[in-house]
Amino acid sequence: MKDHIAVMAGLGAATLIMAWLPSVSKKIKISYPILLLLIGAVLFYLGVPLLWPDPFWPDQWLLYISEAIVIISLMGAGLKIGKNYSIKDWKIPFRLILITMPLTMIAVYFLASEFLLMSIPASILLAAALAPTDPVLAAEVQINDASSDKNNAVEFSLTAEAGINDGLAFPFIFLAVLIADSKLELSHWFLDKFLLKIFIGCLIGYIIGTSVGYLIERLPRIRGISNPHGFVSLSITFMTYGIAELLHGYGFLAVFIAALSIRYREEVEGSIKEKMHDFVEEMEKLLLVIWILIFGGSLLNGILNIASWKGAVFAGIFVLVIRPVAGYLGLWKSNLNGIQKLAISFCGIRGIGSIFYLSWAFLQSDRFVEKNIIYSVAAFVILFSIVIHGLTVPWIMQRVNKD
C-alpha cells in the first residue's frame, strides 16, 4: 500500500535535485544526464518501486512517453532560435541534414548488416533511428539564451539540426517497416512518405505558428484580455502535433516550424516568447528526469546483455567514428573554423528520439525478429553518448565560446 508513497518521495527528491543539478554540472564540468543516470541506477539498486523495465517496457508505453518528451523539446528548440539568421546561416544545419545524416545512415546500415548480421529492414530501421541528433539530451550544446536574436554558430547549428532532422528521419522508418512487411512500392513511398508528408508537416506548422503568433499579438489589444501565460506553448505543441498527424503530415516537423514561426514573428513581444520557452523547458526537464532515471534502472536490469560486447563495439564506433567523420564531411569547405567544425561534428548526441522511432516501428510491424537486439544496441548508443558527450561537451563548448 505504501509503494506509491515511496514512488512519490523518490520522484520528488529526484526532481528537487534537478533544480540545482544543471548549475552543479556546469561547475564540475560533467553533464547532468550522467548524474541522473547514476541516481536512477542507485534507485533501482535500492529497490525503489518504480515501473522499472524488465528489461523493456511495452512498446506502447515507450512510444507515448518518448513522443511527449520529443515534441516538447522540439517546441523549446524552435523558440530558442533567434530571428536574425540569414539563408547563409541556415546553410550549415542543412549541410548536416543533407550530407551528414545520409552518410550516417549509410555507415550504420553497413555496420549493422555486416557486423551485427542484421536483416535489411532491421539495418535500415536502426540506421534511421540513430541518424537524427536528439533534441532532448542535446540541450547543453544548444542555444542557452532564448532572449537573444543571434547566437554562436555551433549552438545555432546543433539546435537547428536537432529540430529539423527528427522529422526527416521518419520517411526511412517507414521504408524499413514497408520492406519488413513486403509492401514497398518505391515511387509511392517517395511521393507520399517523403515529399507529401514533409510538405504537409511544414505547411501545418507554418499556418498554426503564424496564426497563433497573430492572436498572441492582437488579442491583448482588446481591453480586458491579458497576455497569455507560458503554458500556451504546451497547448500549441500538442495541438500542432495532433493536427499535423491527423492531416497526414509529420508532427515533429510541424511543431518545430510552428515554434520558429512564432519566434520569427516581429510583433510578438519578446517577454512572451521567453515565458513560452521557459515553461516548455521546465516541462522538458521534468520529463527528462523521469526518463533518465528509468533508463538508468533498465541498464542494471539486463537491457545491455542482449547485444553483449557487439553492442558496445557498435556504440563506440558510432559515437567516436561515424558521427564525427560524417559531420566533418558535411561541413567540409563551409565557412566555419576548425574548432567549430570539430565541435559540431563530435556533439551529435543520441537519445530519446531513437527510442520513439523504434517503438513506433515495432508497433507497426511484428516482422522485426531482431527487435530486442535493436533495442539493446540503441541502449548502448544512448549510454555511450550520455557518458562520452557528458564528460567532453562542457569542455568543448567552453573552448568554442572562448574562440
Feature annotation, model-predicted:
Residues 1-403:
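Transmembrane helical cores of multi-pass secondary ion antiporters/exchangers
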